[in-house]
Amino acid sequence: METILEQQRRYHEEKERLMDVMAKEMLTKKSTLRDQINSDHRTRAMQDRYMEVSGNLRDLYDDKDGLRKEELNAISGPNEFAEFYNRLKQIKEFHRKHPNEICVPMSVEFEELLKARENPSEEAQNLVEFTDEEGYGRYLDLHDCYLKYINLKASEKLDYITYLSIFDQLFDIPKERKNAEYKRYLEMLLEYLQDYTDRVKPLQDQNELFGKIQTDFEKKWDNGTFPGWPKETSSALTHAGAHLDLSAFSSWEELASLGLDRLKSALLALGLKCGGTLEERAQRLFSTKGKSLESLDTSLFAKNPKSKGTKRDTERNKDIAFLEAQIYEYVEILGEQRQLTHENVQRKQARTGEEREEEEEEQISESESEDEENEIIYNPKNLPLGWDGKPIPYWLYKLHGLNINYNCEICGNYTYRGPKAFQRHFAEWRHAHGMRCLGIPNTAHFANVTQIEDAVSLWAKLKLQKASERWQPDTEEEYEDSSGNVVNKKTYEDLKRQGLL
């Protein structure tokens, strides 16, 4: 039986070896998406084991049962040599009884892990289960969610490719359609997105993500800024949809002038008691001014279950909105897969059956070639890689001017290799964003301008030029006097003031 100190030593060794293997795993170059996903899952498994070992170590150091303290006292007391020989005797006795006992060092186990990573078996190459439609983490498979969506009551009938474009635009759906069936659809969609994220991005801490989403949602919900769920007005009447606006009344006496019938209809719209004299009804109705239904005294309501129902509806709406908030976040995380899915579906719909079969055969052959062992490419001059994954020829590298670097200060000192990439970047998002930050339009006037100072000075010059070319009504607008003489506006006004016309 291992001693407490030996268990602690073994746990410390395992932690260090796990850290070393995780570092090597993360530094290993992944050439395909399959390799990246499998590597992330191996890393997460080691992280989970690391946390488990750390928890065991903490329990041993806490020493709630006092065994560690007893062992320390035994080996550090006055009879330490007697204790040493006693334990040595126990070890010899154990090996005498079990002469063929095999002990596998921990280093051997981790060496086997490294070998399995370098020469993976067929099972190790498919660590995660994906459907054929998902293409091992490349695409989304939302067909079940799509069928659930188009079967919702009063839902718009659309095709699958359109659904892929708008399935996250939940804020456009009217609140009247967000019922229990709609909530079940959201739960189904969210469950798939969470499961897919867990398979494609296993290192994503979903517990931390949930806390972040919840904090942001609570803040937006309280402020009334959450998309699709605007904050209700402060008046209790407008909150309940009544047609009487209390903002025009400053006292209950003014409300009393409306009469018994009008006050009764307004109180009924709120679910309040509508009996009593004219003064009592007016005072009861005026007491709701500037208040929400939840803040009113329950004794004012005709039936308490109605107020509970209103509060229940608010909680139900908040639950639905929180589901939407989670879906928004996961869709943003899976933005790349969503775009690839849209392109893949669009491409499949435009192809014939024979072309689809050929594409599937190509994908199978590509996956088989990806699974082959990748050799280390010799690339001492750091040349760009071609379509085959190998460095392009040096003469082609020189021909395209890829040895020339162009720096653009507007793009945040980003470096572009080759004149072609440099010229193309003026129309791309990075340069356009830099120009927008400077408050300058990205027009043809600023082609080949890479310095911020040059762009600002050119923009000032262009503004002056445009100002000088702008039409000046005082000097360019022409008038005709009574004698038929044509003069500009300024001269005409001067002559008119002097009475010379």
Curated annotation (Swiss-Prot):
The modification Phosphoserine is found at S54, S121, S295, S299, S365, S367, S369. A motif (Nuclear localization signal) lies at residues 175-179. Residues 342-354 have a biased composition (Basic and acidic residues). Residues 342-374 are annotated as: Disordered. One of its GO terms (molecular function) is zinc ion binding. A zinc finger (Matrin-type) spans 406-437. The modification N-acetylmethionine is found at M1. GO terms for biological process: mRNA splicing, via spliceosome; U2-type prespliceosome assembly. One of its GO terms (cellular component) is U2-type precatalytic spliceosome. It is found in: Nucleus speckle; Nucleus. The keyword Zinc applies. InterPro entries: Matrin/U1-C_Znf_C2H2, RNA_Proc_DNA_Dmg_Regulator, SDE2/SF3A3_SAP, SF3A3_dom, SF3a60/Prp9_C, SF3a60_bindingd. Component of the 17S U2 SnRNP complex, a ribonucleoprotein complex that contains small nuclear RNA (snRNA) U2 and a number of specific proteins. Part of the SF3A subcomplex of the 17S U2 SnRNP complex which is composed of three subunits; SF3A3/SAP61, SF3A2/SAP62 and SF3A1/SAP114. SF3A associates with the splicing factor SF3B and a 12S RNA unit to form the mature 17S U2 small nuclear ribonucleoprotein complex (17S U2 snRNP). Identified in the spliceosome 'E' complex, a precursor of the spliceosome 'A' complex. Identified in the spliceosome 'A' and 'B' complexes. Component of the 17S U2 SnRNP complex of the spliceosome, a large ribonucleoprotein complex that removes introns from transcribed pre-mRNAs. The 17S U2 SnRNP complex (1) directly participates in early spliceosome assembly and (2) mediates recognition of the intron branch site during pre-mRNA splicing by promoting the selection of the pre-mRNA branch-site adenosine, the nucleophile for the first step of splicing. Belongs to the SF3A3 family. This is Splicing factor 3A subunit 3.
